[in-house]
Amino acid sequence: MDSALVLFAFLFHCLNVATAAPVNPELQEMKSNVIDIAKELSLRLESIIQTSIGPKFSPPSDELNGLSSIMAVLDECTNQISDNFDEAKKIKVDISSLMDSMSEWSDKHCGEQPSTQAENQTSRRFSITESMQAVTRLKHFLLLLQNNSDQLEIC
């Protein structure tokens, strides 16, 4: 009886594996690139947060609702980080790399994406404080993205 049950479980597993949908190599490459960059950027942001002097911020709870919402949050965080903030250039380059990977995929496989509006940084009064809030938000958002990378498949 036990061997029949084991055989049934094995055959059921083989059937599931054999009937699985084929994996899109472009999608897997984009997801892999995004996750790798997100991990590297998360570590850099964690270092910035740990060494910062000043108030600690709790991030807003962003939700992942597909590729366009992910790109919108990343764009918003980029706009909130002041160019005067330490390591802003490195952070923005990494975010740009993330967005380029997602944008390339989106251009090929999704419809037209809504445009995002850049905010003018010259009118900011508390740019360093706002930058720290954006860094904290971005770090938590990247962790959420790494844990929910399937959202990258949704246009």
Curated annotation (Swiss-Prot):
Gene3D superfamilies in UniProt: 1.20.1250.10
Cystine residue pairs: 110-155
InterPro entries xrefs: 4_helix_cytokine-like_core
Tissue: Expressed at moderate levels in the liver. Expressed at low levels in skin, gill, muscle, intestine and eye tissue.
GO CC annotation, single: extracellular region
Record has Magnesium as a keyword: no
Span of the signal peptide: 1-20
Compartments reported by the entry: Secreted
Keywords: Disulfide bond, Obesity, Secreted, Signal
Top-level division of the source organism's lineage: Eukaryota
Family, per entry: Belongs to the leptin family.
UniProt function note: May function as part of a signaling pathway that acts to regulate the size of the body fat depot.
Record's protein name: Leptin-A
Species this chain originates from: Oryzias latipes
UniProt gene name: lepa
